[in-house]
A protein has these predicted regions:
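Cleavable N-terminal signal peptides
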Residues: 8-11, 21
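Sec/Tat signal peptide C-region and signal peptidase I cleavage site
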Residues: 15-23
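Bacterial N-terminal signal peptides that target proteins for export
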Residues: 1-8
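Residue-level detector of alpha-helix boundary/anchor positions
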Residues: 10-13, 117
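Exported/periplasmic ABC-transporter solute-binding proteins
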Residues: 24-140
Length: 140
């Protein structure tokens, strides 16, 4: 019985860790983007290739992190897809000529640098990453 209780406690702790870690992802944008917040549905539309602007009219270009923990957390928290399903969706859009695959960058610092220097760029990074020169968007 003690083993079952301990297993249940460890499983619950793991789930709490996943929820807490999702909050560790920041959505960032170039300062040229007018918005200060973005809805989860707008974010999903932009990062799945279904929109090129936010509801306020700001044109945006999504920038992706290459596979890793922050990328997986972003997809899980805001897109609701696994990396495999997410990339399959983009490949379908690219193959049909409806969109071009977003730029994939290696590491949070590269995303911050690219977003800071490219009008309309929007990306995501770890909350712990220094992010001078970019705007943090609140996700509602």
């Amino acid at each position: 019985m003690k083993k079952i209780v301990l297993c249940a406690l460890f499983a619950a702790a793991a789930l709490v860790g996943v929820t807490r870690s999702q909050a560790q992802v920041l959505v960032i944008a170039n300062p040229s983007v007018k918005a200060t917040e973005v809805s989860k549905s707008d974010l999903k539309d932009v990062f799945t290739g279904n929109a090129t602007s936010l509801k306020d009219g700001s044109r945006v270009v999504p920038i992706l992190l290459k596979a890793g923990t922050v990328h997986e957390e972003f997809l899980q928290a805001y897109i609701g897809k696994s990396d495999t399903a997410y990339r399959a969706g983009w490949r379908s859009l690219v193959f049909s000529g409806q969109a071009s695959m977003p730029k994939n960058l290696e590491g949070d610092a590269a995303v911050v640098d690219f977003v800071a220097h490219n009008n309309g760029a929007i990306g995501y990074i770890s909350k712990a990453t220094p992010h001078e020169g970019v705007k943090v968007l609140a996700v509602k």
